Swiss-Prot record:
GO terms for biological process: chemical synaptic transmission; neurotransmitter transport; regulation of synaptic vesicle exocytosis. Plays a role in the control of regulated secretion in neural and endocrine cells, enhancing selectively low-frequency neurotransmission. Positively regulates vesicle fusion by maintaining the readily releasable pool of secretory vesicles. (Microbial infection) Receptor for C.botulinum neurotoxin type A (BoNT/A, botA); the toxin probably binds via extracellular loop 4. Recognition by BoNT/A relies on both protein-protein and protein-N-glycosylation; glycosylation of Asn-559 increases its affinity for BoNT/A. Also serves as a receptor for the closely related C.botulinum neurotoxin type A2; glycosylation is not essential but enhances the interaction. The gene is SV2C. Changing S561A: Decreased molecular weight probably due to glycosylation loss, decreased binding to BoNT/A HC. Changing N565Q: Decreased molecular weight probably due to glycosylation loss, no change in binding to BoNT/A heavy chain. Greater reduction in weight. Residues 1-57 are annotated as: Interaction with SYT1. SUPFAM superfamilies: MFS general substrate transporter, Pentapeptide repeat-like. Coiled coil: none annotated. This is Synaptic vesicle glycoprotein 2C. It comes from Homo sapiens (Human). NCBIfam families: synapt_SV2. GO terms for cellular component: dopaminergic synapse; plasma membrane; synaptic vesicle; synaptic vesicle membrane.
Length: 727
């Protein structure tokens, strides 16, 4: 009986020893596999695995193996029958430990403290170390994925969004004269349209940039572009000026998020050697947006025949068609963006390892198939993710209803955006943020300020040239005639019109002096900058015309009738004769950016971002002095093209530097803040330079030159990001 009991006891001990040994060997193999996966992209040595392949046991450093530890003679009677499953679990109550026990309980076995025992500073320090390791690994992964079809597809999708931003900036200036007059805007409120759009873009840049760091690049960009497209379309149909302002405000608010989100999104799928060049190529779409807006304005707005009316109150003029056409790039980008994935770098930053891995594999497979290498396997199996620091959200007890919960959620998100923004002024990016603030402000102030000043300087030159082309018709008689075409830039003096019919005529800059109209009919007539001075009308009928009393100067009416006069505000802005030239000059100025874009893209990675940034701003400041010698329209247009061509290189390099200087967790927020500052500087520049147009030419030139040169010198003090990985 005793022998059988001892045999069973020995058998049980032997089985436990075997199970314990198998467990240790399994742990060892799993640890080796995990270590190899983590070391694959961190360039660590694999020597620690070479001597462990055939080990009989796996022990922590500092412990030795005693071959008789499991023998009956070496075993303790006190531990006989003990099983590992019977041990007290961590977290069970084990009594209050002494001070010495507390010190030795965890640290003595060489295990790190749990996160629950660490303060926030320690956790953030560990997270920074994880982010540095992830940055190196992610760069190698992107290099393995290659640059190909996926990046080019995303390039064109994001390019459409950037094009929509460029269109939005130009739309304001092009529709401003027509919209203000068409919507019956008094002079006191005429400047609100331009300011309200920039205000919306300023707030939108800050909000959407911060949101992109919270919910993702793709989601933020989809929402902001949808807001822009919807309210841009809606603004083309509204009739009241207040509602029109509201629509343009929200349209600007939506498009404000395009630039910070687009550049952050695209930079995170580019390898280091491709980043500067391809971000510069992406900047070309902003220029394409300006060219598109200028060309459409040139082709659409001056054509007043492209309009219709529903009664006398609802007028749909050509500038509204222009607004609809300018919303098409935004709609196209929204549709295309739905087929693109989220930024994998953002997903890794927020701890979504599996989703990021799937997207990186998609990028790799897409590019390899395009290269004709579909059999090439994506070798990455594990990617480092930064330590996630939990943030507690306090939800009040009265948030039972859905709208209260929604309010708390919105308030929490806004508070999170604000905290991320404040971190842009923490170490190690605080100094860079201050320098970037100066560079963004000076470049925007000088660029947009002179952009307002140029057209106002050119306009008097255009007026003089237009006056030289005026056709003068004097002392002639016309009887039994019908005119149904456009009359433009003419002066009729001492004329007599008998039994004439003016049907559907567009009068543009036409003046009648000392003329007589007998038994004439004006039907469905539209006039712009047209006046009748000291004229006599006898038995004349006016049907559905826009001839307001102020257009008849010292004129006399005998037995005349007015029927169905057009009500509401008609397009009567005075300098319509220069509309073609204004759009054409803007078209040329935008087209001049093309050489600067090409040069900056080709040289960005060769001469460096800082050389490009500082050199372009200094050269732009110097080029302003040539404006003193501009005495003709063609010379001023040439100076405008030169200035725009030099400035665009500074804009491109500044975009690249800004993206590369901020880490992923605050990249879009920092970019959004700087872009919002850019819009504020643009408004300030418009106000200051606009007030100096009629005073002197020297002050705007000196101001712009000084600001640009100073900003360029500060830009040279920024750290060079050409060789660093994207944090």
């Amino acid at each position: 009986m005793e022998d059988s009991y001892k045999d069973r006891t020995s058998l049980m001990k032997g089985a436990k020893d075997i199970a314990r040994e198998v467990k240790k060997q399994t742990v060892k193999k799993v640890n080796q596999a995990v270590d190899r996966a983590q070391d694959e992209y961190t360039q660590r040595s694999y020597s620690r695995f070479q001597d462990e392949e055939d080990d009989d046991d796996y022990y922590p450093a500092g412990e030795t193996y005693n071959g008789e530890a499991n023998d009956d003679e070496g075993s303790s009677e006190a531990t006989e029958g003990h099983d590992e499953d019977d041990e007290i679990y961590e977290g069970e109550y084990q009594g209050i430990p002494s001070m010495n026990q507390a010190k030795d309980s965890i640290v003595s076995v060489g295990q790190p403290k749990g996160d629950e025992y660490k303060d926030r500073r320690e956790l953030e320090s560990e997270r920074r170390a994880d982010e540095e390791e992830l940055a190196q690994q992610y760069e190698l992964i992107i290099q393995e994925c290659g640059h190909g079809r996926f990046q080019w597809a995303l390039f064109f999708v994001l390019g459409m969004a950037l094009m929509a931003d460029g269109v939005e900036v130009f739309v304001v200036g092009f529709v401003l004269p027509s919209a203000e007059t068409d919507l019956c805007i008094p002079n006191s409120g005429s400047g609100w349209l331009g300011s309200i759009v920039y205000l919306g873009m300023m707030v939108g840049a800050f909000f959407w940039g911060g949101l992109a760091d919270k919910v993702g690049r793709k989601q933020s960009l989809l929402i902001c572009m949808s807001v822009n497209g919807f309210f841009a379309f809606l603004s083309s149909f509204v009739q009241g000026y207040g509602f029109f302002l509201f629509c343009r405000l929200l349209s600007g608010f939506g498009i404000g998020g395009a630039i910070p989100t687009v550049f952050s999104y695209f930079a995170e799928v580019l390898a280091r050697e491709k980043r500067g060049e391809h971000l510069s190529w992406l900047c070309m779409f902003w220029m394409i947006g300006g060219i598109y807006a200028s060309a459409m304005a040139w082709a659409i707005i001056p054509h007043y025949g492209w309009s219709f009316s529903m009664g006398s109150a609802y007028q749909f003029h050509s500038w509204r068609v222009f607004v609809i056409v300018c919303a098409l790039p935004c709609v196209s980008s929204v549709v295309a963006l739905t087929f693109m994935p989220e930024s994998p770098r953002f997903l890794l930053e927020v701890g979504k390892h599996d989703e990021a891995w799937m997207i990186l594999k998609l990028i790799h497979d897409t590019n390899m198939r395009a290269r004709g290498q579909p059999e090439k396997v994506f070798t990455v199996n594990k990617i480092k993710t930064p330590k996630q620091i939990d943030e507690l959200i306090e939800i009040e007890s009265d948030t039972g209803t859905w709208y209260r919960r929604c309010f708390v959620r919105i308030r929490t998100e806004l508070y999170g955006i604000w905290l991320t923004f404040m971190r842009c002024f923490n170490y190690p990016v605080r100094d860079n943020t201050i320098k970037l603030t100066i560079v963004w402000f000076t470049l925007s102030f000088g660029y947009y300020g002179l952009s307002v000043w140029f057209p106002d300087v050119i306009k008097p030159l255009q007026s003089d040239e237009y006056a030289l082309l005026t056709r003068n018709v004097e002392r002639d008689k016309y009887a039994n005639f019908t005119i149904n075409f456009t009359m433009e830039n003419q002066i009729h003096t001492g004329m007599e019109y008998d039994n004439g019919r003016f049907i559907g005529v567009k009068f543009k800059s036409v003046t009648f002096k000392d003329s007589v109209f007998k038994s004439c009919t004006f039907e469905d007539v539209t006039s712009v900058n047209t006046y009748f001075k000291n004229c006599t009308f006898i038995d004349t009928v006016f049907d559905n015309t826009d001839f307001e009393p102020y257009k008849f100067i010292d004129s006399e009416f005998k037995n005349c009738s007015f029927f169905h006069n057009k009500t509401g505000c008609q397009i009567t802005f005075d300098d319509d004769y220069s509309a073609y030239w204004i759009y054409f000059v803007n078209f040329l100025g935008t087209l001049a950016v093309l050489p600067g874009n090409i040069v900056s893209a080709l040289l960005m990675d060769r001469i460096g971002r800082l050389t490009m940034l500082g050199g372009s701003m200094v050269l732009s400041g110097i080029s302003c002095f040539f404006l003193w010698f501009g005495t003709s329209e063609s010379m001023m247009i040439g100076m405008l093209c030169l200035y725009n061509g030099l400035t665009i290189s500074a804009w491109n390099s500044l975009d690249v530097v800004t993206v590369e200087l901020y880490p992923t967790d605050r990249r879009a927020t920092g970019f959004g803040f700087l872009n919002a500052l850019c819009k504020a500087a643009a408004v300030l520049g418009n106000l200051i330079f606009g007030s100096l147009v009629s005073i002197t030419k020297s002050i705007p030139i000196l101001l712009a030159s000084t600001v640009l040169v100073c900003g360029g010198l500060v830009g040279l003090c920024l750290p060079d990001t050409r060789t660093q990985v994207l944090m």
